[in-house]
């Protein structure tokens, strides 16, 4: 009886907190345990967004660097991104925060049920970020960018996309297999079908949990969003929803800097004998081999020093991508791969390329139905701009707005992308009929 009274009290607090705009502390973890819900909260905290920009440890996780690049419009009439005036990652992030310096967010880390690469049941983790006060407008389902250390997993930090919470949106951000509670497993990097399934399973777990908590959004359509690895993944999530007629209404998809053609992206490392982001070479290879259960011996393709340190540098989840790049110590692809790994005609590489092709969203027999905003910097030094041009050619009949231009390197492009999405969301608030201002 006492337990039921506590649950009723919690629900009352949630209802008043989510809909009346009052700042009330609610123990979501206690509620999730009491109700035996689909999403079990393991940690909860409230974060002041302005404090983030003054936190050097948080900033350094996103590779804060200076650059002299300035946004320029591309040729061919493609619209430029909404411009942030700063030319540094830290500066653009500050501009993101300046929209609402007093904003606060409630972070809920938790676990949910999904499946692994063998289709066996597994518990995965992720984070939900809610406005600390006021109603929730819509959900934004985020597919995160490439990470390497477990401390970068969304359940363990405040993800960069989480800054959008200040506009009144609730963000759902899965960790993926290999991070969070499954950090002991190899991450099936860029294996699209399973990752899209894992992302959607978190959405299906979180929605009924928040409904029980009285925190349903004002609108029942959602946004999808992702940059880099997340850009390709969010398109795979859109495909999963539309191809299988899942009961999710997509308002718009925001995709930035994505490797939509995985084989082409990887092959550029081989063709140019240069990898500006060297950790991507072993991470992509391992993701394809493990995630697709290929019968390949990676030691025949990876240079011995890379293969021998793979578990320590990559699979331990101790190091960030920047730290792994420093440990690798070279950007010359032939120093990362064996002659067999550099030989596109070898049996091993042919099988690897086949898996990459099958996981490339551009090889799917599908055209996006929901509106898409696609962003890519022509200066991207990690994911070649050609990916975006191939997407534009493949999906020429789709409802896609393109934003291509000189927006800086891959990292700066990420922050500009989020800045642009924020501007589009603000426009969307004013134009609920679906017409977006650029």
Residue positions per predicted region:
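Accessory cap/linker subdomain of secreted extracellular hydrolases
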Residues: 60, 256-364
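Alpha/beta-hydrolase active-site loop
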Residues: 189-212
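C-terminal catalytic histidine-bearing segment of alpha/beta-hydrolase fold enzymes
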Residues: 348, 353-355, 359, 379-382, ...
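Short beta-strand/loop motif that positions the catalytic acidic residue
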Residues: 368, 373-380
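Short, surface-exposed "cap/lid" segments of acyl-processing enzymes
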Residues: 116-125, 129-167, 182
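Primarily recognizes the serine-hydrolase "nucleophile elbow" in alpha/beta-hydrolase
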Residues: 204-276
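Catalytic-loop region of hydrolases
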Residues: 21-134
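C-terminal motif of bacterial Sec signal peptides marking the signal peptidase cleavage site
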Residues: 14-17
């Amino acid at each position: 009886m006492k337990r039921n009274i506590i649950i009723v009290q919690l629900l009352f607090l949630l209802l008043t907190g989510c809909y009346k705009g009052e700042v009330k502390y609610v123990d979501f973890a206690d509620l999730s345990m009491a109700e035996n819900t689909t999403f079990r909260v393991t940690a909860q905290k409230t974060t002041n967004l302005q404090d983030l920009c003054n936190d050097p440890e948080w900033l350094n996780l996103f590779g804060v660097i200076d650059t002299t690049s300035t946004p320029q419009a591309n040729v061919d009439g493609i619209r430029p991104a909404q411009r942030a005036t700063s030319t540094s990652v830290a500066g653009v992030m500050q501009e993101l925060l300046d929209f609402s310096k007093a904003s606060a967010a409630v972070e809920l880390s938790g676990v949910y049920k999904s499946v692994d690469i063998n289709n066996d049941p597994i518990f995965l983790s992720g984070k939900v970020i809610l406005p600390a006060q006021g109603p929730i407008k819509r959900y934004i389902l985020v597919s995160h960018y490439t990470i390497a250390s477990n401390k970068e997993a969304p359940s363990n930090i405040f993800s960069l996309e989480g800054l959008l919470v200040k506009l009144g949106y609730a963000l759902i951000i899965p960790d993926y297999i290999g991070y969070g509670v499954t950090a002991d497993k190899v991450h099936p990097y860029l294996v699209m079908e399973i990752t899209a399934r894992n992302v959607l399973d978190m959405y299906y777990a979180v929605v009924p949990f928040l409904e029980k908590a009285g925190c349903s959004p004002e609108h029942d359509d959602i946004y999808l969003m992702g940059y880099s690895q997340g850009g390709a993944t969010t398109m795979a999530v859109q495909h999963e929803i539309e191809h299988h007629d899942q009961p999710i209404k997509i308002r718009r998809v925001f995709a930035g800097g994505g490797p939509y053609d995985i084989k082409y992206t990887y092959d550029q490392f081989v063709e140019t004998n240069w990898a500006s982001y060297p950790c991507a070479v072993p991470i992509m290879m391992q993701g394809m081999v493990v995630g697709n259960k290929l019968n390949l011996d990676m030691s025949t393709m990876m240079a011995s020093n890379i293969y021998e340190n793979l578990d320590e540098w990559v699979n331990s989840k101790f190091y960030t991508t920047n730290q792994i790049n420093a440990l690798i110590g070279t950007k010359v692809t032939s120093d990362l791969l064996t002659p067999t790994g550099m030989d596109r005609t070898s049996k091993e590489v042919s099988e690897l390329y086949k898996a990459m092709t099958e996981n490339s969203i551009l090889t799917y027999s599908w055209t996006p139905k929901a509106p898409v905003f696609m962003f890519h910097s022509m200066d991207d030094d990690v994911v070649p701009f050609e990916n975006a041009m191939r997407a534009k050619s493949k999906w020429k009949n789709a409802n896609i707005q393109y934003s291509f231009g000189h927006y800086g390197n891959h990292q700066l492009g990420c922050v500009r992308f989020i800045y642009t999405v924020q501007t589009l969301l603000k426009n969307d608030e004013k134009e609920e009929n679906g017409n977006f201002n650029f």
